[in-house]
Amino acid sequence: MEIQSLDGVLGEELAIQNEVKKILLSHKTTKAILPLAPISQFSKWKIPKQGFYAPIDVKFVLTPHISERAQVRGVVKLVDSRDLSPSRELYRSKEFNIGHGLVIEGSQLPFCLPVGDYPLQFEVTVLQSQFRETANLYSTSVEWRMMSSTTPLSRVRSVMGAAQQPAMKLQPNFKMSLESSKGGGMKPHQKKSSKPNGHSRRGNLSGEVGGSSSSLPSGAQTGEWIDNDYGDGSSEYSGVST
């Protein structure tokens, strides 16, 4: 139950001063909160518990489980979970239709943070919904690399003032599902029904709507497990050093 690297277990590998490690991490869940930090809650991750880190090559994907016709609206935020001031909101997407799905990417986020002191996390907030429960409206996944060092990373700016900089970009992910559903057609034995009260398939979307974590790169992953500590039995974690 720990992250494995190609050379063994990650942990005491930052003994050399100024050595920079890059670790690939991924996480999938149906919860509204998705961490982007090596916080102590994930003690099973044998990641250095001191030093500094910066998230790079971040890809957050929201996969809808509902039709866009439901008109469920929401926003995605990247926040500092220990800061209660307005500046805790480091990034906020525009309001969007959750049924369309969403992809948020950031190549070089301007965060250079002490490990464990500033746990960052994505938060999905449903603003408008006709459903009483929101737990099954979507699933989220994030894949990112953690650049870690025993000393502050000079290539990465401080977190101060980062909220004012457009470090991330987003785009609807619904077009991906339309492209993947092309050419499906009807099976040969299926015929159109002329009955006025026949069952209609209108409004049903393919399970590929919005993409999924399977679309994220996974060739380099060497460890994967189910973790219930975060309150979600379907959460999946994996990681590998690069």
Curated annotation (Swiss-Prot):
Keywords (A to Z) from UniProt: Transport, Viral movement protein
InterPro entries: TBSV_p22 (IPR005332)
Compositional bias segments (type: Basic residues): 188-202
Domain of life of the source: Viruses
Keyword GTP-binding among record annotations: no
Keyword match Transport: yes
GO cellular component, one term: viral capsid
One BP annotation, GO: transport of virus in host, cell to cell
Residue span of region Disordered: 162-242
Low complexity biased stretches: 203-223
Role played: Transports viral genome to neighboring plant cells directly through plasmosdesmata, without any budding. The movement protein allows efficient cell to cell propagation, by bypassing the host cell wall barrier.
Similarity comment text for this entry: Belongs to the tombusvirus/aureusvirus movement protein p22 family.
Descriptive protein name: Movement protein
Taxonomic lineage from the root: Viruses, Riboviria, Orthornavirae, Kitrinoviricota, Tolucaviricetes
